[in-house]
Regions:
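Nucleotide-state-sensitive switch-loop elements of NTP-binding domains
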Residues: 1-119
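A generic alpha-helix structural signal
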Residues: 7, 64, 89, 228-231, ...
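A generic structural signal for short beta-strands and their flanking turns/coil linkers
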Residues: 15, 25, 213, 259-261, ...
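Conserved C-terminal guanine-recognition region of P-loop GTPase G domains, centered on the G4
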Residues: 67, 82-170
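Short aromatic/hydrophobic contact patches that present stacked aromatics
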Residues: 76, 214-216, 295
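Short glycine-centered, acidic/aromatic-flanked micro-motifs in structured strand/loop junctions
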Residues: 79, 140, 298
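C-terminal accessory "lid"/substrate-recognition subdomains
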Residues: 128, 132-138, 143-288, 301-303, ...
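C-terminal edge-of-domain segments
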Residues: 290-300, 306
């Protein structure tokens, strides 16, 4: 969503841009969300995951080499939320990319509803992705609460993560905490010119292991009206009104820890809808084109339990927000 806003700003400046979508999983849903940007001055490219680390690095380099021939003024590299930042910096230091590209700005998006207690792997990712950022932009701000309070809480959390990984940097004023609909041309200019920092930090033992998972569910044949309550169940948001209801929901603990769900489905009228959900918020918006896929991202996920939850016909007790 942020890339749509930022890329639109760059296009208003008359720039010719390329967007490289870099997804952690094997299917890139975000490409479909950006398709309306594609045109004479904006082209979309994609790298899908689902491969080993070295293959992914090679694909990243190869794609940037081909994009260098296109005469772009700016290339936006969109990593997945689960990303090894060393891949970006190391790749751009290699021949011939070091002669063809110059790093402009490193922009880190942090969820304003970020949970206070994260796993060690998640804390490392938060710290490593914030360490070199020129600017941190908060997403999913709660419009009913003071943005300053949310901003201070996130800054404190990011700084704790930086300390945990042995990074001496501390975030202070490098944060933009505004509803994205309220971002001005001056805000986008600040983001565009925010540059980046090079910081050192420690990679804790075990972070090389794949603690995060991405599960793909194709052709569930369920409508928006059926999937929205099912997705809320994944986050444990069913309304438990009595002991029997709580007993029915106890197996939700076996699902694993779900961070995000995104994808597409049709509503009862047959129109495509885009779903984007976190532990804090769910949005469902119309989209011109889609495909029947739902992606679940989290830690220690049990695929059979997740599928059972999504395909469960029993949706009573779930309330739409």
């Amino acid at each position: 969503t942020f890339i749509k806003e930022y890329a639109s700003y760059l296009l208003r400046q008359g720039l010719n841009i390329g967007i490289l979508e870099n997804d952690f999983g094997a299917v890139n849903v975000d490409m479909m969300l950006l398709q309306e940007l594609q045109g004479e001055k904006c082209e979309l490219e994609m790298i899908s995951g689902g491969c080993d680390k070295e293959t992914h690095r090679r694909r990243f380099k190869t794609k940037l080499i081909s994009m260098a021939m296109c005469g772009y003024d700016r290339v936006i590299v969109e990593p997945s939320g689960i990303y090894d930042v060393d891949e970006f910096f190391d790749g751009l230091r290699e021949e011939p990319l070091d002669r063809w590209y110059e790093i402009g700005s490193v922009i880190t998006i942090v969820d304003a509803g970020l949970e206070e207690n994260l796993s060690d792997q998640a804390e490392y990712l938060l710290g490593s992705e914030a360490a070199d950022a020129g600017v941190i932009v908060l997403s999913r701000l709660d419009k009913d609460n003071a943005c300053e309070e949310q901003e201070n809480r996130i800054i404190s959390h990011v700084n704790r993560s930086l300390e945990r990984i042995g990074c001496t940097r501390r975030i202070e004023k490098e944060v933009i905490a505004k509803d994205w609909d309220m971002l001005t041309e001056e805000d986008f200019a600040q983001i565009q010119n925010s540059s980046y920092q090079i910081e050192s930090f420690r990679r804790p033992e075990g972070t090389e292991k794949d603690g995060f998972q991405t599960l793909y569910f194709m052709n569930l044949n369920r409508t928006e009206e059926e999937l929205v309550p099912a997705v809320k169940k994944l986050f444990g948001k069913r309304g438990c009104t009595d002991d029997s209801e709580k007993e029915n929901n106890k197996n939700l603990n076996d699902i694993g820890r779900v961070f995000r769900v995104k994808g597409f489905m049709k509503n009862q009228s047959g129109d495509w809808m885009e779903l984007n959900a976190t532990t804090q918020k769910m949005t469902v918006n119309p989209i011109k084109e889609g495909q029947e896929i739902l992606i679940v991202i989290g830690e220690d996920l049990k695929e059979d339990k997740v599928r059972e939850c999504l395909e469960d016909e029993c949706t009573e007790g779930a309330e739409n927000e």
